[in-house]
Structure formats: structure tokens, C-alpha cells
Amino acid sequence: MVDFRTYEVVKLEDVAEYARAKQGKIYPAGTSTLQISATRGEISFLSEQGYVHTKNVAIIPQAGIDPLYFNIAMQRNIDLFMHKYAIGINIQEHEVGKFPIYLHDYETQKAIVAMFRQLEHEMMVERDTVNVLKDLKNNMLSNMFV
């Protein structure tokens, strides 16, 4: 049963593998990245396999944790983490393991991911609508003084 109020708070090092990204290494889809050099806490997600810049830490969640949910959980807590562990504009690699993760059961993880995907879809539809209206406006303005 989906229950958003029941979760446990765990450290990243207990539920994921992490290491500074290596140049030329291909990381699997579902890898989250956290920029640790000259950063303001930028987190990204690999939706397909690819390379990760060496100023990032590549984070691969353990089996039983949805990779996109894991990324969402990281984005939720990045401000708290940065406030506590950032040293100037950098983060020490070993401190990444202390990142707090709010971990729901797998069914709830899937529900949260489905909601975020729906929101992303709706945002994309709205962006497309705005672009169509901009094109219409430009077309009308260019034809106004024919």
C-alpha cells in the first residue's frame, strides 16, 4: 500500500555506491550525479548510459531502490546537505556518504516516480503550448504590416 508518511532516513553510503567520476568511463542509466567541485549542489540524472564529468560524484543506488526516486530524494535534501557539508564552493568526496536519504518502500517509490513523470509531461505540454503561441505571435506581427 502506498504510504507517503512512512519512511526511514538513511545515509547515502548505506544504500548506494558512490565515487568520483572517472574520465572515459561509461556509467549505467539510472546513475545520479552530484557536482562536488565549484558547486552550488547541482544534481543530475542519467536517463541512458553515458559519461560523467570528473567534477561530479557518480552515485548508483542499490537494487530495490528506484533510480529516479533516489534522484528525487537527493534533490529534496540537497539544501540541507550543502548547508552542513559544503566547504566554500566544494564538497569533500567522503562527505557525500553522509547525504540523508528519505527512503520509502518500493511501492511508494514507484508511485512518487509516476507522479513526477506526470508532472514532467504536463510541463512539457505547457512549454509546447507557449512555443506555439510565441510562433503565432511572431507570425501575426510579421504579417501585420504587409
Predicted regions, residues:
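Short amphipathic beta-strand starts and helix->beta connectors
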Residues: 41-43, 80-86
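A short beta-sheet element
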Residues: 31-75, 92
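Generic structural signal for secondary-structure transition and capping sites
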Residues: 20, 78-79
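Amphipathic alpha-helical segments
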Residues: 100-142, 146
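Short, surface-exposed secondary-structure edge patches
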Residues: 21-26
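A short glycine-rich beta-alpha junction/loop motif
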Residues: 51-57, 87-107
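Structured loop/turn residues at beta-strand edges in well-structured enzyme cores
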Residues: 5, 28, 94
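Non-catalytic DNA-recognition/assembly elements of restriction-modification systems
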Residues: 1-20, 103-106, 130-132
